[in-house]
Amino acid sequence: MPGATFSVSDANFDKEVLKSTEPVLVDFFAEWCGPCKAMAPALEQVAAEMKGKVKVAKLDVDQNPEVTQKYTIQAMPTLMIFKGGKKVAERVGALTQKKQLQDWITGSI
């Protein structure tokens, strides 16, 4: 299911996340982050299965300092859910099980 998530950056964060008509889960990650890599397969599955209910975006913190600083990201992975242009949920740490991710998302949107 690769390709169910999409990348966002400092340049398109407002358009793709804050102005989205559906909720967006943003995975703030780093290429060197082991827990981020461990969570990636579950995130892809959830993105595919929840398509139409929530979009799943990935933001590389090392490549996008503006958004990273704006939301005070200090540990990876950090997951945030945005709805209607506002952050409605945040979780620091990996959720490697698909059901854990789905339950957290469903409870937040």
Language model: regions and residue ranges:
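A short beta-strand-turn-helix
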Residues: T5-V24, P65
